[in-house]
Amino acid sequence: MKTKLDRIAKDTNLFLDKFVDKQSKSKLIPAMKYGLFSGGKKIRSKILIDVGSLLAIDYKKLIAIGAAVECIHAYSLIHDDLPCMDNDKIRRGKPSTHIKFGESTAVLAGNSLLTMAFEILASPTLKISEKIKIDLIKKLSECSGHLGIAGGQYLDLSYEKKKTSQSKIIEMEIKKTGKLFSFCCAAPAIIKKKNIKEIKFFENIGSDIGLLFQIADDLIDFKG
C-alpha cells in the first residue's frame, strides 16, 4: 500500500513539475510550486487511480487527471490558511504559503493553481476525446466552486462559534472535502462513458470516502 502510494505521489509530482516547467515563467511560479509540492500523500490521486484501474483505464491518463485534482487541493489549502479564512501559519511542518510569500501572492498563487487544473484537463497531454474532457472539466468545476470546496469553506466559516446541527456539519464536510473525492471516483466512470445513474453511484462512494476522511482528520486535530 505505502509503496504504491509513494509511486503515485512520485509520478504525480513528476507530471506536475514537467507541466509547470513548460509554462511561461512568472513571478508566481515559486509560490505555486511551494504550495503544490508541500509533501502531501496524494490520497485523492490514489483513489482516482484505484477506481480507474478497476475500469481498465491507462495509468498515464489517470496520473494527468490526478495532477489536476492535486492542483485544486493545493489551491484550497493555500486559501484555507489565509488570515481571513482559518489563519493557519504552519502547513505540514512548514510556514504556510502566505507566511512565506505574503498574503496577496498566496491568493494569486492559489488562483493560478485552480485555473491550471483545468488547463491540464484541456491540454493535449491528456489523450482522451474533447467531449470527455468537457465532461471532466464541468464535473471538477462543480466540485471546486460554490457547490463544492468553496461552498464548504463558506459554511465552515459561517458555523464558527455557533451551535450547529449534525446534518449541517455533514453537509459542510461533504462540500469541503467529499466533493473532490467524489470527482476522483466519478472521473473514471465519465471516461468509460457510463450512464448518469452509474456516474452518480461512483460519486456517492467518493463523497462517503471524503466524509470519513474529514471526520478522521477532525478527530486527529481534536486529540492533538
Regions found by a protein language model. Give the residues of each.
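Mg2+-dependent prenyl diphosphate-binding active-site environment of isoprenoid biosynthetic enzymes
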Residues: 10, 17-224
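N-terminal leader/targeting segments and the immediately adjacent pre-domain N-terminus
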Residues: 1-13
